């Protein structure tokens, strides 16, 4: 992204970088992370079986396995995002890039990816697992599990971005 001498607002830069992230996602086969999430979801769900929510210990073990899958999927989404573009980011920063805009664009784009992965995880796991019918918080068990999966995947994704920003 070329920044001229005129100052480009942070919001405009976020939009520019969201477009860049989308192009990279499509052209560099970033969509493979969705397939990776689907494969991990299927493997974990097959191993857990349909009795996961029947017995307490199976529920604990299954919950741990599903959340572990969320963490792995989230970290692998973003672990290399920043470090592979380090030279480009430095050059663009000298040309006027606000680092906060760059990070915000990554956070927004990765949130969208994490929403898709949470939906994939819930959809695939529901084919193999029998989720409970009662939902104490929001009245819908699907919504509760979707929010839980999304928050776990997104937290791990942000951790991956932080690691990527630190590593040279």
Question: Residue spans of the language-model regions?
Answer:
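Membrane-embedded and extracytoplasmic architecture of multi-pass membrane proteins
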Residues: 1-168
């Amino acid at each position: 992204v070329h920044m001229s001498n005129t100052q480009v607002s942070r919001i405009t830069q976020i939009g520019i970088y969201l477009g860049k992230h989308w192009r990279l996602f499509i052209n560099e086969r970033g969509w493979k992370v969705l397939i990776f999430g689907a494969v991990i979801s299927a493997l974990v769900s097959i191993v857990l079986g349909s009795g996961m929510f029947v017995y307490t210990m199976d529920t604990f073990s299954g919950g741990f396995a599903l959340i572990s899958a969320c963490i792995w999927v989230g970290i692998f989404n973003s672990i290399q995002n920043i470090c592979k573009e380090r030279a480009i980011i430095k050059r663009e920063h000298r040309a006027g890039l606000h680092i906060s805009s760059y990070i915000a664009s990554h956070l927004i784009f990765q949130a969208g990816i994490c929403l898709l992965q949470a939906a994939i995880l819930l959809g695939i796991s529901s084919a193999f697992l029998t989720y409970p019918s009662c939902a104490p918080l929001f009245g819908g068990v699907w919504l509760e599990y979707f929010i839980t999966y999304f928050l776990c995947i997104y937290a791990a994704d942000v951790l991956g971005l932080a690691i990527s920003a630190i590593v040279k």
